[in-house]
């Protein structure tokens, strides 16, 4: 059986870049890594409805620069940027370092795999027929400009006694081609029957 590899990690240095960009000596490396995880966790918890596909972190000396990619920049910025300033201060308390925040707008959320996975999870949580949900989401992504999409949902679909896997594929999704711009996202849907895992692969070109 073929071994599974994370599509983003597999392409770092080819079509993808590191989500954390900094250098550290042996003594500080683990501390910085844990700090990055705390920052990401905090952002996703506080802004869970802001449609954030990814958070990138850069460090230069003591300064920590956080790039937040979002489909809803208005939710993050607030009136006259007050929300961003409040949030930056919270992150400075969390890290004990000066923090600079940059909000980057995502213009086509239908082509961001993690946002598509979250949309599917939300629909499955409302007990919508999974086949209909997958087809609708796939059609929207293809219409937005995606070359191909693959969706996999697993768990007790439609409240079935035994868990099973539902798949939907449209267009080309070359997982083994390194130069292919492939985006990957995962989300968990919570239903009365239990948790359902949603995985999405989107081929952008």
What positions do the PLM features span?
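RNA-contacting regions in translation and RNA-metabolism proteins
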Residues: 1-205
């Amino acid at each position: 059986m073929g071994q599974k590899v994370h599509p983003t990690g597999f392409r770092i240095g080819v079509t993808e870049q590191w989500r954390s960009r900094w250098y550290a000596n042996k003594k500080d490396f683990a501390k910085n890594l844990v700090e990055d995880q705390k920052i990401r966790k905090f952002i996703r918890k506080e802004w869970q409805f802001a449609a954030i596909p990814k958070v990138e972190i850069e460090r230069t000396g003591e300064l920590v620069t956080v790039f937040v990619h979002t489909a809803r920049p208005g939710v993050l910025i607030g009136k006259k940027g007050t929300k961003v300033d409040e949030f930056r201060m919270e992150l400075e308390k969390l890290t004990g370092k000066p923090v600079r925040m940059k909000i980057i707008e995502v213009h086509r959320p239908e082509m961001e795999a993690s946002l598509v996975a979250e949309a599917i999870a939300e629909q499955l949580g409302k007990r919508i027929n999974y086949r209909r949900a997958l087809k609708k989401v796939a059609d929207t992504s293809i219409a937005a400009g995606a070359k191909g999409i693959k969706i996999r949902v697993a768990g007790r679909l439609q409240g079935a006694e035994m868990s099973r896997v539902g798949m939907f594929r449209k267009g080309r999704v070359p997982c083994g081609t390194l130069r292919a711009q492939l985006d990957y996202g995962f989300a968990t849907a919570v239903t009365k029957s239990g948790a359902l895992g949603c995985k999405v692969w989107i081929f952008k070109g």
